[in-house]
């Protein structure tokens, strides 16, 4: 059977002791299939021994690769997704991490599953991203994308912060808390889940606002349409840290405004044949597990 994809880039988890074996096994297997194989330059530098393969930057991968295989955990996938979003390169994840909500191909059968995907046997879904910016005195001082979430929190402070929340230009409330998680459906099974936020199906066009330890019994998570524009303004004298997918960080000052909404960019995520969202949740979250009695 002829390959559905002709070129593939491999992106591995940096500074991981066991990623090299998986990267080389996949690279050699795909090259034997006749595919052009690139290894992302940071990955190549981290694992060493990649002289037999072409090393490529994210920009080169975005312009030349037809598929990117991300080998690591969800954090590796989040980074790759942000870096490649504007290029619309489809991504598939091989899980070397823990839960792996985004990297759903098991290492044990990665070669077989990737063989199926290369042959065109896969399902594809689009995951929307958040476009976030920080304004200071009306001027943009930071901007980035987030696939999972944007988190405004108290940072190193040993006390709560205070901020105003506005949606589509309308004031909603002033809140005192440890912060706020603004989550996409993709991020609803990450930090937001730990803060008692709702699980949002990837097909839901919604953005979840999940307070962190609010100083009010009535403060509850709220799900908004993904057409909303959200603003959080820090009130004096409180500074805060703003985290994007738990990777990029910006230290905000009192008076700064975080503005965000759905980005026009989206991530193309490929799943192996037979993938089922509910089965994935059942496995990762141990739904229907039988209690053990010692």
Curated annotation (Swiss-Prot):
Q: What is the name of the protein in this document?
A: NAD kinase
User: Which source organism?
Assistant: Azoarcus sp. (strain BH72)
Q: Which Pfam families does the record match to this protein?
A: NAD_kinase (PF01513), NAD_kinase_C (PF20143)
> What enzyme class is recorded for this protein?
transferase
Catalytic-site annotation from UniProt: 74
Q: Which GO terms describe its cellular component?
A: cytoplasm
- Places the protein is found: Cytoplasm
Instruction: List the residue ranges forming a coiled coil, or say none.
Output: none
Q: What is its EC number?
A: 2.7.1.23
Q: What does this protein do?
A: Involved in the regulation of the intracellular balance of NAD and NADP, and is a key enzyme in the biosynthesis of NADP. Catalyzes specifically the phosphorylation on 2'-hydroxyl of the adenosine moiety of NAD to yield NADP.
Kindly list the cofactors needed: a divalent metal cation
Q: What is the lineage of its organism?
A: Bacteria, Pseudomonadati, Pseudomonadota, Betaproteobacteria, Rhodocyclales
Instruction: Write down the Gene3D superfamilies for this protein, in alphabetical order.
Output: Probable inorganic polyphosphate/atp-NAD kinase, domain 1, Probable inorganic polyphosphate/atp-NAD kinase, domain 2
Question: What catalytic activity is recorded?
Answer: NAD(+) + ATP = ADP + NADP(+) + H(+)
Sample GO molecular function, one term: NAD+ kinase activity
The text of the family note is: Belongs to the NAD kinase family.
Q: Where does NAD(+) bind?
A: 74-75, 148-149, 159, 176, 178, 189-194, 247
């Amino acid at each position: 059977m002829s390959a559905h994809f002709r070129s593939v880039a491999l992106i591995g988890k940096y500074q991981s002791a066991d990623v090299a074996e998986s990267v080389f096994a996949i690279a050699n297997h795909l090259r034997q299939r006749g595919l052009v194989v690139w290894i992302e330059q940071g990955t190549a530098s981290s694992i060493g021994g990649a002289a037999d393969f072409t090393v490529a930057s994210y920009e080169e991968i975005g312009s030349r690769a037809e598929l990117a295989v991300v080998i690591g955990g969800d954090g590796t996938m989040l980074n790759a997704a942000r870096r490649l979003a504007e290029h619309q390169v489809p991504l598939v994840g091989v899980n070397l991490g823990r839960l792996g909500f985004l990297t759903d191909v098991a290492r044990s059968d990665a070669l077989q599953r990737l063989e199926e995907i290369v042959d065109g046997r896969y399902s594809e879904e689009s995951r929307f991203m958040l476009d976030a910016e920080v304004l200071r005195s009306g001027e943009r001082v930071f901007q980035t994308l987030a696939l999972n979430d944007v988190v405004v929190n108290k940072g190193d402070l040993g006390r709560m912060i205070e901020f105003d929340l506005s949606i589509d230009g309308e004031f909603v409330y002033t809140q005192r808390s440890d912060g706020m998680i603004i989550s996409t459906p993709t991020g609803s099974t990450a930090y937001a889940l730990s803060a008692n936020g709702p699980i949002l199906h990837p097909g839901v066009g919604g953005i979840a606002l999940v307070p962190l330890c609010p100083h009010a019994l009535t403060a509850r998570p709220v799900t908004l349409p993904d057409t909303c524009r959200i603003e959080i303004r820090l009130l004096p004298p409180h500074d805060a840290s703003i985290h994007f997918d738990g990777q990029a960080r910006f230290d905000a000052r009192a008076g700064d405004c975080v503005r965000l909404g759905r980005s026009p960019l989206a991530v193309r995520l490929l799943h192996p044949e037979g993938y089922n969202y509910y089965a994935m949740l059942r496995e990762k979250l141990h739904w229907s597990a039988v209690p053990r009695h010692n």
